[in-house]
From Swiss-Prot:
Alphabetical list of Gene3D superfamilies matching this protein: 3.40.1310.20
Protein name stated in the entry: Replication-associated protein
One Gene Ontology term from the biological process aspect of the record: viral DNA genome replication
Sequence motif: Nuclear localization signal, positions: 146-153
Superkingdom as given in the UniProt entry: Viruses
Organism: Chaetoceros protobacilladnavirus 2 (Chaetoceros sp. DNA virus 7)
Localization (cell): Host nucleus
Keywords for this protein: DNA replication, Host nucleus, Viral DNA replication
Cellular compartments per GO CC: host cell nucleus
SUPFAM superfamilies given in the database record: P-loop containing nucleoside triphosphate hydrolases (SSF52540)
Keyword match Endoplasmic reticulum: no
Main location: host cell
Length: 484
């Protein structure tokens, strides 16, 4: 008489068997596929899912749970892994003759071993079985015969039929590290093909070596976070061999790294500083060192606005990356006046700007100008035609330094290790202009005169043209030898 009809499953085994399925899901190419009768292929691997097992205490009637596989109960079995929980490690439970008569005609392979579940410690058997195509057994018949001897029975059908699938399944049910102590692998003497463990076919995605996607993403995120924000993505990826291996296929990492500046709070523009005067007096060096006490890494705090970039604020490695100091070097009015007022608007946040292949928000608190020209000459044509435009610029200035060509003692103003840059603070003098551009020009004439407007260039007649061509006077002198 068969045992009571209750089906119990161990937690083992859902994870264990699903792992096997994912590990051996190889493509079924023609070279490795095992030949089947066309009518058999569809029926050989019915899609039966493993479901969560009911508690052991519950006595579930078989009819209640059979509905999940009843529609496939008449399907014929082909390749599958059998799992059951025997009462002991008697070898007979691993032999097909225990369950079926005339087994050599029914099966082509029957190989397995006893194992202990690492979590629950329960004894169970894993057996890989291949049925003979001409004498395949139906699912419900096979299940019923095994249930006569064991209470908990699970069948997991293979999704593919290939040599790789076969060897992977054999490796799964004969692995040494999982075998129960004191037991041996059972290899049926009537197997139609070798059923030995093949180390060359060990699955690279074994459960012990798997790293979930979440863990991998977290490792990548922490690696990116450990690098300075001003680094480019290429610098992070190619830092060393470990970074190349970790981030080679990380397509989202570059976008994540670019967005790290969003964590910084928006800064308010507080200072607009002007360093003007003679060349070689240390203006640029002072600008680059500004704020180094708070942030020693220059790339993190300092950005030099390159007038050659035009409307763009850099790109790639030269792109603006949220630095708090913006430096206009050798400034002579190259920036549009309206845009400059936005960049220097005290008490406001920086405007949005264009960067190559994207955009950015200026997040600076300090603007520094270094120039060999007095500030009154930067937009002199605009201010001479409309003097009232000087006031919006002047009220934004918070500090002015003049770097003369000579020191107070008459020596050249050339800074070195023993002589720091010499400058004169003219902040109060600029405040006395009170928006009067004429006073600014007078101040320039007194301290650092503006250059006179260049003389008009000569008009050179070119035969075949109806109008003169503007030509540099020096170029004309070189060609003719005569003063223009």
């Amino acid at each position: 008489m068969s045992a009571p009809l209750s089906i119990e499953q161990d937690d083992l085994l859902t994870d264990d068997l699903k792992s096997w399925l994912s590990d051996i899901d190889f493509s079924n190419d023609n070279e490795e596929a095992i030949e089947m009768e066309p009518s058999d292929i569809e029926m050989s691997s019915p899609p039966i899912d493993i479901e969560t097992s009911p508690p052991e205490e519950a006595d579930v009637n078989l009819d209640d749970t059979w509905a999940t596989v009843q529609k496939n109960g008449n399907n014929k079995l082909n390749r599958f892994i059998l799992t059951f929980f025997p009462s002991d490690m008697d070898t007979k439970w691993l032999e097909p003759e225990t369950y079926f008569e005339n087994s050599p005609n029914k099966f082509d392979c029957w190989t397995g071993q006893y194992e202990y579940c690492p979590d629950t410690g329960k004894l169970h058997a894993h057996i890989y079985i291949e049925c003979n195509h001409k004498h395949r057994i139906r699912f419900n018949v096979f299940h019923r015969e095994i249930r006569k001897y064991h209470q908990s029975v699970q069948l997991q059908l293979a999704k593919r039929a290939s040599k790789k699938q076969r060897q992977s399944a054999i490796n799964y049910v004969t692995a040494d590290f999982k075998r129960a102590p004191g037991s041996l692998v059972f290899r049926w003497e009537h197997n139609k093909f070798p059923s030995d463990f093949d180390p060359k076919c060990v699955n690279k995605k074994s459960k012990s070596d798997k790293v979930s996607k979440d863990e991998q993403h977290e490792t990548q995120r922490l690696w990116i976070e450990s690098k300075p924000r001003h680094w480019t993505w290429d610098q992070i990826v190619h830092e060393n061999e470990e970074s190349k291996k970790l981030l080679f296929g990380c397509t989202a990492g570059e976008k994540y790294h670019k967005g790290r500046h969003a964590e910084d709070a928006r800064r308010t523009i507080n200072d607009v500083i002007i360093f003007y005067g003679a060349g070689g007096t240390g203006k640029t060096t002072e600008a680059q060192a500004w704020g180094s006490e708070d942030e020693p890494v220059q790339e993190c705090r300092y950005y030099r606005r390159n007038p050659d970039d035009g409307a763009f604020w850099g790109g790639g490695r030269t792109c603006y990356k949220g630095q708090r100091i913006v430096h206009y070097e050798e400034f002579a009015g190259q920036e549009a006046f309206g845009r400059l007022k936005e960049v220097c608007d005290i008490g406001k946040h920086g405007p949005a700007v264009n960067v190559k292949n994207g955009g950015a928000l200026l997040n600076h608190d300090t603007v520094i100008f270094t120039s060999n020209i007095h500030p009154a000459g930067w937009f002199h044509k605009l201010w001479e035609s409309d003097p009232k435009q000087w006031m919006p610029f002047e009220r934004r200035i918070t500090q002015v330094r003049f770097y003369p060509s000579h020191r107070a003692d008459g020596s050249l103003n050339q800074p070195d290790e023993n002589n720091p840059p010499y400058f004169i603070d003219q902040t109060e003098e600029f405040r006395q202009f009170v928006g009067d551009y004429d006073k600014a020009k007078e101040h320039a004439e007194l301290h650092w005169p503006l250059k006179e407007a260049p003389e008009p260039t000569a008009q050179v007649f070119v035969p075949g043209r109806s109008h003169g061509v503007t030509e540099n006077t020096f170029f004309e002198y070189c060609k003719t030898g005569r003063a223009p």
